[in-house]
Amino acid sequence: MRHRKSGRQLNRNSSHRQAMFRNMASALIGHEIIKTTLPKAKELRRVVEPLITLAKEDSVANRRLAFARTRNVETVAKLFNELGPRFAQRAGGYTRILKCGFRAGDNAPMAYIELVDRPEVAEAATE
């Protein structure tokens, strides 16, 4: 019985799943929007949101925890220098999932996952 076992398996072993979500979290924090399958996006939300909450308070201990979870120095720097201050007044709900149809090859449901207060690229280019 799988009672009280949270999280999706996604047809991967645990080390593959952990590495995949580390990479996806780094990509989302770096680019602030990524396109992936809907189940992966929903599961990625459970990885990224606690990292942003951790980044709200800048301390050496929190930076080490974030590095232990992402293993990427650039990701940790962006988390604590940009995203932590940006989301300081927001109590959770840092990501948004937008469904965007189905993948051509296997008809898998696709989605964009993005950070909610992401600066618009088009607005920045016109100003």
From Swiss-Prot:
An example Gene Ontology CC term for this record: cytosolic large ribosomal subunit
Annotated keywords: Ribonucleoprotein, Ribosomal protein
Gene Ontology terms describing biological process: translation
InterPro entries named among the record's database cross-references: Ribosomal_bL17, Ribosomal_bL17_CS, Ribosomal_bL17_sf
Molecular-function annotations in GO: structural constituent of ribosome
Assembly: Part of the 50S ribosomal subunit. Contacts protein L32.
Family, similarity comment: Belongs to the bacterial ribosomal protein bL17 family.
Xref: PANTHER family: LARGE RIBOSOMAL SUBUNIT PROTEIN BL17M, RIBOSOMAL PROTEIN L17
Annotated protein name in UniProt: Large ribosomal subunit protein bL17
Species, as recorded: Actinobacillus pleuropneumoniae serotype 3 (strain JL03)
